[in-house]
Curated annotation (Swiss-Prot):
HAMAP family: DNApol_error_prone. DNA polymerase involved in damage-induced mutagenesis and translesion synthesis (TLS). It is not the major replicative DNA polymerase. It comes from Anaeromyxobacter dehalogenans (strain 2CP-C). This is Error-prone DNA polymerase. Belongs to the DNA polymerase type-C family. DnaE2 subfamily. Keywords: Cytoplasm, DNA damage, DNA repair, DNA replication, DNA-directed DNA polymerase, Nucleotidyltransferase, Transferase. It is found in: Cytoplasm.
């Protein structure tokens, strides 16, 4: 009986060789283990994008994974660039591989932000490869003698030729040529299979990917397609038969694999952040920051080229933003006034007398605690701070905290609103450093949710910044640390239903019309399995009659989840002590000025690599703008609503009953986190009365509590309709504040500790399983451990099942309590502004778009319902942004005068900011006396003048919109001379007067909003009397009453947790009506529900207390509605 030879596949591409490989890394690793390979080298083209995923699977399978990449190399062989596989033999070789991949994407000696290259243009010169050859093994799939000689000179015994047999014409000649060159030059020849798939069945999809890459169809691709499915993973037995004449080629492959001993586990937790140091004597003030580059340090004679920050430090000048009642009133933040003796005694003082590492962190925490608590902190806080600092020191995370502190310090020094959130708000250290705004000790938050020595993973601090000013913060990080040591985390954009259908359909040769009809059948995220014969028939397609349509659907399902391209993560930054490009390749992002690493956040987490999340939050921008507006337009001195300092959210008056009463009425359009349909339905039932109620409100409308069946029990208990009970008596201290119902991740962790005997570290591992995507199977596998632990404590039967069900719900994502509390601060601040300063709040929201749940026209209608006068855009009064003015158009409000909201020029669709600024610059010299004067002074072209006229922005100069448009058409194209002072060359036509509906339609088409009135008010007289109810009237109808409603569609939602139910919000002149469209109704009326801007809906009233919905039986487009470009916001 013969034994299969040892064999390792050295040349394997995954789907992260974008549009080349047709299998996921995990599929390749799993298949390699199944086939009994002794190792597998993942070598994607110009990247290490999929290596961490492969590594995670290889650990599970016990398969040696060789780290490699297939580089496109210029200058190795004659003609066009050649492919060269490089495999890492050791850590030094891995660093060199990352540098070479970075060089391929970024070019030589790149500084600043290198320009992005198309993937087909990415290449690295062979000279760079030769210079970085140490620790790398080169595998060349060619036979050119000169190229082989150059490889041998550069790599010596670490070079080999690769040969493959795919049963195609001409390949035997290539195999013989390679073997001949190898013998002649003393270079080994190894058998590989140039793997593109893990199974032969995936070859059809690989053909489609090839067509997508080349922009062709399978009918026209010709030789671009592989002639068969032989480029798949093969086992040793099959290869031994295929290469019976050359067994030494298989042995050579196994030998090369044995030489490549580097494993990804070697970089786990590697590279702490650069040290931050503060000069002795610089602790008492200033924010001056100085740092030396490695080159400068070398010139100064420094022995290390590791950059460090040498700061003159101060805490943020902003007091803590905490309207919660337990938050103390804070004094102004002091500087750090450390004595020289205390600094010198600390072991963290370096030889130059500067504070660094733990010494600096401890000193910052000491002074920060005095700042937060107005003196020495309470004993429980001091104990918690000491415990946290000891753990930070033992785990070596001081630089991480100091780096985040420095970034926050920079933002505050520039007047940028920011606030930490997420699990970091569980940390008292983060609170006293000014990173977060929630006092975790007073709120009883669980620190282990943030850092745990038991689980041994790095902390994760998320900081939100004003989204319009976040770029300043990002560029500060690049500048401070250098682009070779700082990069943004990537996000892998994958194929979804619609994009998969489009690409596959085009590749299979479907007509553009067929592709469009197919793509319109699904939303971007819908499961293609829902596309059945009925939907195909609606689109005029028949799968039974069209093999290509059937194949398109089948292949698109396979393609879903494949990587399509890289994007930028919402805010993750990796910052390292040694060059980042020695840990992970860097490449330019599509956005100018950004560079990204080739791994996403899950890859970094898998390897325990630190990242800092610097996120943009639109509400912080809106709050900053609103506070600035109030500072400029202060109410009268006698006003009962004081204006807070524009940089200090903490000075907003706390615990105002009027604010809670407003939120309890679901009057929350524009308010952070509580403006969705679900939150507005919850509000009348929850009736928030204090800050902690807002914390619960933020957390409860989440997939975790919804899927765990926790919302209704909590509300019933809150209303006294259900007795508060605990499935296990010792859980009462954990669940008492939420009436026996777990709503937060921290509660789920404590529940596992108390009810099942988990250690805190095990409980956090459970939390990780619960919140990780694809976690349901893992959580179900832990049920035995949970049930056994509960049984030991006498919990069984229904109680045990209830606890497990609640835990299982958190696999659908639940909020940590600290995160909900951080967001609740912004809920309160935005609600206070809406309640007492609706004009400033609405103005700030308009100027911060795009953000939030509603389009500008809904924000304007809501402002009008709150008594705000809104005036339209006008070249004589509007700024670029929307603004506040007084009773006199274009002039500030006088003391005691109500502010009026003026829509800005930015609202005009398609109008460039440069054109708007030119108008404002010209107007600064004096008001415009006529349209002709406007054109002359602002140098407006005909196109922009016409756009202004269409938008009604010439109202103060030409009140009649149609006449203004007519006159604007007479302007010379270059904005120069006018015909007879804007009179047309022929007598002006007698234009009919525009109707009110025409005016509103024109407003929506050009600006997306109208200040003249709601379109429904214009069409209601034609709807047939009182038969069609207004949104306001719905509240007076009894439960299950038949009803018809009509309105403008402002929001469509189809949440994953709703099991196919679609929620539609209709707006009319009185408010908003919420429609519930069940799956069967949606399927019958899908095109109307998804596409009609105005709807007429018939159904029945559904009442639950003060919450009123309409359960829809049928819908139709509203025929009488004016034709306008009204855009709803769709959420899937």
């Amino acid at each position: 009986m013969s034994h299969a030879p040892r064999y390792a596949e050295l040349r394997c591409k995954s789907c992260f060789s974008f549009l080349e490989g047709a299998s996921h890394p995990e599929e390749l690793v799993g298949r390699a283990a199944e086939l009994g390979l002794s190792g597998l080298a993942l070598a994607d083209v110009n990247g290490l994008y999929g290596i961490v995923r492969a590594h995670a699977e290889a650990k599970r399978q016990g398969l040696p994974l060789i780290v490699g990449a297939e580089l496109v190399v210029a200058g190795l062989a004659p003609g066009r660039p050649a492919r060269l596989v490089l495999l890492a033999q050791d850590r030094e070789g891995y660093a060199g591989l990352c540098r070479l991949v970075t060089r391929a994407h970024c070019g030589e000696g790149w500084t600043g932000a290198p320009p992005r290259r198309e993937r087909d243009a990415v290449a690295v010169p062979f000279e760079a490869v030769a210079a970085g050859a140490r620790g790398l093994f080169a595998l060349y799939p060619g036979a050119d003698g000169d190229a082989v000689a150059r490889l041998k000179d550069a790599f010596g015994r670490r070079a080999a030729l690769a040969v493959a047999r795919h049963r195609v014409a001409g390949e035997e000649a290539r195999v013989l040529a390679a073997r001949s060159a190898g013998r002649r030059l003393g270079v080994p020849v190894a058998v590989t299979n140039d793997v593109h798939t893990h199974a032969r069945a995936r070859q059809v999809l690989q053909d489609v990917l090839t067509c997508v890459r080349h922009g062709t169809t399978v009918d026209r691709a010709g030789r671009r397609l592989f002639p068969n499915a032989e480029r798949t993973l093969k086992g040793p037995e099959e290869l031994a038969r295929l290469w019976s004449d050359f067994p030494e080629g298989l042995a050579a492959a196994a030998d090369i694999a044995d030489q490549c001993r580097f494993r990804m586990e070697e970089i786990r937790g590697e590279h702490p952040l650069p040290p931050v140091v503060v000069e002795r004597g610089g602790l008492a003030g200033g924010v001056e920051v100085a740092t030396s580059s490695p080159a400068q340090a070398a010139r100064d004679g420094a022995r290390s080229t590791t950059p460090s920050l040498r700061l003159r430090a101060s805490l943020p000048a902003e007091p803590p933003a905490a309207p919660a009642p337990e938050a103390p009133a804070a004094a102004a933040a002091p500087g750090l006034a450390a004595s020289a003796a205390s600094v010198a005694a600390d072991t963290g003082a370096d030889r130059d007398g500067a504070l660094a590492g733990m010494a600096l962190l401890r000193e910052l925490v000491r002074e920060g605690a005095r700042w937060r608590y107005g003196g020495e902190p309470p004993e429980d806080v001091a104990r918690q701070l000491a415990r946290e600092l000891d753990l930070v020191e033992s785990l070596g995370y001081a630089s991480y905290f100091l780096t985040v502190w420095d970034v926050v310090r920079f933002a505050r020094s520039r007047g940028i609103l920011c606030q930490g959130r997420g699990s970091a708000a569980n940390s008292a250290v983060c609170y006293v450093l000014g990173i977060t705004s929630i006092d975790p000790v007073r709120m009883g938050l669980l620190f282990e949710r943030f850092i745990s020595a038991e689980r041994g993973e790095p902390p994760d601090i998320d900081v939100d910044f004003e989204h319009e000013r976040r770029e300043e913060v990002l560029q500060y990080v690049y500048q401070r640390y250098g682009r070779d040591r700082a990069g943004m985390v990537c996000e892998v954009i994958t194929y979804r239903g619609k994009s998969a259908l489009r690409d596959v359909g085009k590749a299979l040769g479907l007509s553009l019309g067929q592709v469009d009809r197919l793509a319109k059948l699904v939303g971007s995220y819908e499961d293609l399995g829902q596309v059945g014969p009925e939907l195909l028939a609606q689109a005029g397609l028949d799968a039974a009659d069209s093999e290509r349509v059937r194949m398109t659907l089948a292949l698109a399902r396979e393609l879903q989840g494949f990587p399509r391209h890289l994007s930028i993560h919402v805010g993750g930054f990796v910052i390292t002590r040694r060059p980042l490009c020695e840990t992970v390749p860097i490449e330019p992002a599509a956005m100018p000025g950004r560079t990204i690493v080739q791994w996403d956040k899950d890859d970094l987490a898998e390897l325990d690599l630190l990242k800092v999340d610097l996120l943009g939050l639109g509400m912080l921008t809106a709050l900053s703008r609103a506070l600035a507006l109030l500072a400029r337009h202060r109410p009268a001195p006698a006003s009962p609503t004081p204006v807070p300092h524009p940089d200090a959210l903490a000075t907003i008056p706390a615990e105002d009953p009027e604010v809670y009463e407003m939120l309890g009425r679901a009057d929350s359009i524009g308010v952070f986190q509580v403006e969705s349909r679900a939150q507005m339905s919850l509000a009348p039932r929850l009736r928030p009365r204090n800050f902690y109620d807002l914390v619960i409100s933020v957390a409860i409308i989440r997939p975790g509590p919804i899927q765990g069946g926790m919302i209704h029990p909590y509300l019933r208990r809150r209303d006294g309709k259900e007795q508060v009970r605990y499935p296990y008596a010792p859980l009462e201290p954990v669940l008492a504040r939420t009436l026996g119902v777990p709503l937060f991740q921290e509660q789920a962790m404590r529940l596992a500790v108390i009810a099942a005997g988990f250690t805190p570290g095990e409980a956090d591992e459970l939390r990780r399983v619960m919140t990780h995507r694809r976690s349901h199977e893992k959580l179900a596998a832990m049920k035995a451990r949970l049930v056994a632990g509960m049984a030991e404590r006498g919990i069984s039967g229904a109680d045990a099942e209830e606890i497990f069900k609640q835990l299982l719900g958190f696999a659908g994502y639940g909020f940590p309590e600290s995160h909900a509390a951080s967001f609740a601060l912004l809920v309160y601040a935005s609600a206070w502004l809406k309640r007492y300063h609706p004009a400033a709040f609405a103005c700030a929201l308009l100027n911060s778009q795009p953000m939030g749940f509603y389009a500008p026209h809904t924000l304007v209608e809501d402002a009008k319902r709150h008594g705000v006068e809104v005036r339209g855009v006008d070249v004589g009064c509007s700024g670029w942004e929307s603004s506040l003015e007084g009773a006199a158009p274009g002039r500030p409000a006088a003391p005691g005068e109500a502010a009026v909201l003026r829509v800005g020029l930015h609202a005009i669709r398609g109008l460039p900011r440069a054109v708007g600024e030119a108008i404002l610059e010209a107007r600064a010299a004096g008001p415009f006396g006529s349209v002709a004067e406007l054109v002359r002074r602002a140098r407006l072209s005909r196109a922009w003048l016409v756009r202004l006229a269409e938008a009604g922005a010439l109202g103060t100069l030409a009140p009649d919109r149609r006449g203004a448009v007519w006159r604007s058409l007479a302007v010379e194209a270059d904005g120069g001379d006018l015909f007879a002072g804007l009179a047309p060359p022929e007598p002006e036509a007698a234009l009919p007067e525009a109707s009110a509906a025409d005016e509103v339609s024109a407003d929506f088409t050009t600006t997306g909003l109208s200040v003249r009135g709601h379109p429904m008010a214009l069409v209601r007289p034609g709807l047939g009397g009182d038969r069609i109810r207004t949104a306001r009237e719905l509240g007076r109808l009894p439960d299950r009453a038949p009803v018809e409603v009509a309105g403008l569609v402002i929001v469509r939602q189809r949440p994953e947790t709703a099991r196919g139910i679609v929620f539609v919000s209709l707006e009319d002149e009185t408010g908003i009506a919420n429609l519930v469209v069940m799956p069967d109704v949606y399927e019958r009326f899908r095109p109307v529900v998804r596409g009609a801007p105005f709807l007429l809906a018939r159904g029945r009233v559904e009442r639950s207390g003060k919450v009123v919905n309409v359960r829809v039986d049928s819908v139709a487009p509203l025929a009488l509605a004016p034709s306008m470009d009204a855009r709803a916001r769709d959420f899937h």
